[in-house]
């Protein structure tokens, strides 16, 4: 929520658009105040609702180049590791392509986008600062970066994807990060951290990336062993 409008990241599956809109209204925020729509990764369960939300809010949609292709076509990209398992999604026009590591500014809001391919090749991780009085925290909404795929897909057959994946993990692990969020909450242990009473942990991004690096290495080892 910003001084001149609001930003929404991700839109859930296609049938979630109206639900998300109702929740926004319940918070006392006018739908017309939502000015920009963003995404983490371009799977139907995260971006399927963006078409409806764009219709309801009139917001502009920003996306990475590969995510924009999927959004405007209405189908996942063929080089997606999970291509065979993911559903079509309502096609929607993208208003701005976010090349490389971009910055999105709206009033007093500044969000930094980091290209973090891996879970999908068009995935983005977001970083911004949020303040309550003089108490400011850096928030990172990191893409899940889990090394999962459709049956028959081998990461070891796509070394370029593996290299990009590893670069993404290094990038996320090095980010300044007081509070970590992720589109799949379980990927970043959100429930356990909430039960501990605070989400503030300056080591959260490093710990998150390190755990995912171990998952990726284990997946590659299994593939090398023919499993």
What are the language-model segments listed below?
Residues 15-16, 26-103, 131, 200, ...:
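Active-site HxH/HxHxD metal-binding segment of metal-dependent hydrolases
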Residues 1, 100-137:
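Core dinuclear metal-dependent hydrolase active-site scaffold
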Residues 9-15, 73-84, 149-160:
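Acidic/histidine-rich helix-loop elements
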Residues 133-135, 145-227:
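Accessory terminal helices/loops
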